[in-house]
Amino acid sequence: MTNIRKTHPLLKIINSSFVDLPAPSSLSSWWNFGSLLGVCLGVQILTGLFLAMHYTSDTATAFNSVTHICRDVNYGWLLRYLHANGASMFFICLYLHVGRGLYYGSYTYSETWNIGILLLFAVMATAFMGYVLPWGQMSFWGATVITNLLSAIPYIGTELVQWIWGGFSVDKATLTRFFAFHFLLPFIVAALVMVHLLFLHETGSNNPTGIPSDSDMIPFHPYYTIKDILGFLIMLTALSMLVLFSPDLLGDPDNYIPANPLNTPPHIKPEWYFLFAYAILRSIPNKLGGVLALVMSILILAIVPILHVSKQRSMMFRPLSQCLFWLLVAVLFTLTWIGGQPVEHPYIIIGQTASVLYFLIILIFMPTTSLMENYLLKW
C-alpha cells in the first residue's frame, strides 16, 4: 500500500516540500536561515496574537496597556520581550539570509529573489509600525520623522502624509491604523513566504559551489530536518538568553517615557536594524535625495542579478570578490554605528563616506572585479 503522505491531496504537497524534496548534499549552515526565519515568523505571530488580546490602540491608554501587559498579565512580560527581541532575531536572520544569497549567487533565481525583496520590504514595514504601538517617546517621534519623509514627494507629498496620519499630526487615528496594519501584514508576509517557497521549489536549491547539483541530491528528511532542528535550538536558546537576561539591551530607554508631542528627544533614531538605512538617509543634505537613497539602499538588491557578470555563480572560488563582499559587510556595520550617533563632526563625514562606498561596491566595484576575475581565469 502506498504511503498516505504520497497520496493524500494536502499531505503530498507537504511531502514534496519538506520530506521527499531532493536537496543538494553540500548545503552548509548558511542554508539554515530560511527555516529559522519561518520559526521567527511563527513566534512573532503567536506572541503578537496574545499581546493584541490585551493591547488597546488608543493614545490615552496604549502606553498603560503595555505596562499592564508587563505587570498584570500572566507571563505578559515574557510575551512582550519575546515579541520585541524576536523582531531583532528576525532581522539578524533576514540580513544573514540575504548576505548568503549575495555571497553564493542565489540571486540568479530571479523570481525567488524578487519575492524575497518584497518580503524584506513587508517585514520592514511591519516592524516600523510595531515600534509605534507602545506609544513611548521614540515611538511617537520615530513615527513622526519617518512618515514625514513622504512629504518630500513632489506635488502630493504633504497631502499624502496627512492622509497617512489621518489628521495634521501623528495622533489617535495614526495609532489605530498602524495597529490594524501591524496585525494584518504578518499574514500577508506568511502568504508571500509560500510564494517564495513555490518559486524556490521550481528551480531547486542553490549550493555553496554554485555548480548544478542534479547528480548528487539527498532527501530533505531526515538529513536537513535534523540540521534545521539544531538551528532552531541554537536560535531559540540565544533568543531566550536575550529575553531573560537583558531584555532591554536592544531597545531605547526613551521608549519608557510616554509619548509627548511637546518634548522632542535629543536623538531620534529607529530600532538598530534600520540604522544602516537611516544613516544613508541622513548622509544626504537634500530631503528628497535622502529619501531616494533610503529606498535605493534596499531596492538596489533588485538589480544585483543584472550586475552579475562573473562566469562563476558563487564567490566560493573568487577571492577578490570575497574581499569586496566582506568590505561591504564592514561598511554596513559602520553605517549601523553611525545611524545611532548624533549628527555632528566626525560622524557626518564617516556616514557620507560609508554611504558612497556602499553604493560604489555594489554598482561598480563588484561587477568590475568579476570581469577582472573572468580575464585572469581566461574565461
Swiss-Prot record:
Mutating T368A: what's the consequence? In strain: Isolate MVZ 185904
Q: Where does heme b b562 bind?
A: H83, H182
The note filed under miscellaneous reads: Heme 1 (or BL or b562) is low-potential and absorbs at about 562 nm, and heme 2 (or BH or b566) is high-potential and absorbs at about 566 nm.
Cofactor: how and how many bound: Binds 2 heme b groups non-covalently.
Q: What is this protein called?
A: Cytochrome b
Q: Where is this protein primarily located?
A: mitochondrion
Annotated phenotype, changing P208S = In strain: Isolate MVZ 185904
Q: Which residues cross the membrane?
A: 33-53, 77-98, 113-133, 178-198, 226-246, 288-308, 320-340, 347-367
The top of its lineage is: Eukaryota, Metazoa, Chordata, Craniata, Vertebrata
Question: Which cofactor names does the annotation list?
Answer: heme b
Effect ascribed to mutating T203S: In strain: Isolate MVZ 185904
Q: Which organism is it from?
A: Pygoderma bilabiatum (Ipanema broad-nosed bat)
Q: A Pfam family for this UniProt protein?
A: Cytochrom_B_C
Q: Name one GO cellular component term.
A: respiratory chain complex III
